[in-house]
């Protein structure tokens, strides 16, 4: 009765972490510090509080799949400021659609990419992966081809080695920049290469840019796929870009973002929403518009994460003297000798819950690209981050990394 294709989704990182730790009691003398999940803790910007009352009546209206005018204008202004020149290549009536966060959209885009003309189709996925990409690949009916994102290639999946036969069978390719969880960036040339492949071999290039506005303030803002398209003076054919407010504006519960891309894909996605997926409520669209209009709160958020990474580097300077602070994102990607053992020890002895890298990626040719790393979410207030880093530092003083 049930679709067995989805059995593989039961094996996901948080379920695996629960299986690893739930039967092990934490240290009863220490409060639990949950550093395993990337849920922003800074809190929503205060200026949106009143807007929940301002748009109260709109909860009584069915939302359209289309963006309301104020949101469309806000996104247009945001994109043109963030990616100068973008208005030259975007038709905001045909290339843009609001989505209730990007997790659903990343999943459903796989269904849209299903291509019966491509026999034995392939979905190319970055490894480590976000579970919505994997769900989308399953929806596409394709065989998954994993591309490892490793330190040796600056966590940029190697698309150069994809064969002509593989590319001809590809229905969708998922890439994520800045990378998750390592916070690495890419360059214009990489984007241009990926864009050209998508257009030449006619597949959907899905670019997850949910961390595009979480960056270290001492560096330039990360480049995005739009920067490459602008430089190429190319249209959005074969491209879909995913943008979310969850990380940018500390509102993961708002479920607001947008997809920008190929007008044929957007048109089909709109049809899918009209027939059974989720449109974005009108009050949420109004609040999202206010957030996209404001840059100050986003910059303050980036400063907040800058401080947390400085704290981590200071506490870990003895155990990890060459610790690299990521260019973007809010995860510390910490190398260790045995990530599963360290995860258990930190929980059992120090009541700190972290995510072992092993659970975040698939084994490819007998190798897991994330084995030997911990993902530590530096999303909490600095007092909590200090306490967590102190405990982790104490652990490393008494144990081999």
Give the predicted meaning of each segment.
Residues 78-79, 227-306, 310-314, 390, ...:
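Conserved core segment of the aminotransferase class I/II
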Residues 60-197, 212-214, 218-233, 385:
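Conserved core of the PLP fold type I
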């Amino acid at each position: 009765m049930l679709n067995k294709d989805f059995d593989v989704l039961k094996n996901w990182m948080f379920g695996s972490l629960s299986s690893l730790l739930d039967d092990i009691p934490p240290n009863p003398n220490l409060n639990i510090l949950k550093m395993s999940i990337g849920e922003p803790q800074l809190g929503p910007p205060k200026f949106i509080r009143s807007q929940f009352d301002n748009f109260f009546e709109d909860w009584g209206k069915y939302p359209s799949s289309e963006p309301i005018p104020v949101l469309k204008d806000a996104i247009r202004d945001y994109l043109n400021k963030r990616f100068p020149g973008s208005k030259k290549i975007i038709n905001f009536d045909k290339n843009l659609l609001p989505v209730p966060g990007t997790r659903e959209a990343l999943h459903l885009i796989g269904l849209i990419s299903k291509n019966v003309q491509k026999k034995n189709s392939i979905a190319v996925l970055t490894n480590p992966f976000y579970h919505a990409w994997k769900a989308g690949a399953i929806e596409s009916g394709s065989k998954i081809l994993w591309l490892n994102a490793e330190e040796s290639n600056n966590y940029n999946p190697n698309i150069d080695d994809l064969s002509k036969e593989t590319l001809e069978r590809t229905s969708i390719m998922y890439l994520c920049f800045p990378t998750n969880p390592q916070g690495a960036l890419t360059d214009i040339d990489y984007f241009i290469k990926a864009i050209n492949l998508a257009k030449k071999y006619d597949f959907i290039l899905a670019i997850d840019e949910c961390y595009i506005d979480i960056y270290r303030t001492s560096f330039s803002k990360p480049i995005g796929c739009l920067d490459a398209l602008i430089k190429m003076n190319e249209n959005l054919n074969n491209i879909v870009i995913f943008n979310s407010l969850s990380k940018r504006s500390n509102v993961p519960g708002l479920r607001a973002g947008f997809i920008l891309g190929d007008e044929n894909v957007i048109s089909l996605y709109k049809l899918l929403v009209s027939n059974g997926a989720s449109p974005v409520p009108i009050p949420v669209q109004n609040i999202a518009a206010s957030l996209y209009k404001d840059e100050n709160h986003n910059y303050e958020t980036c400063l907040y994460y800058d401080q947390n990474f400085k704290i981590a580097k200071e506490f870990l300077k003895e155990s990890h003297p060459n610790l690299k602070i990521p260019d973007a994102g809010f995860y510390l990607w910490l190398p260790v000798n045995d990530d599963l053992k360290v995860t258990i020890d930190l929980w059992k002895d120090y009541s700190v819950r972290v995510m072992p890298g092993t659970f975040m990626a698939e084994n490819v040719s007998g190798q897991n690209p994330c084995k030997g790393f911990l993902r530590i979410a530096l999303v909490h207030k600095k007092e909590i981050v200090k306490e967590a880093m102190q405990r982790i530092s104490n652990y490393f003083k008494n144990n081999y990394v």
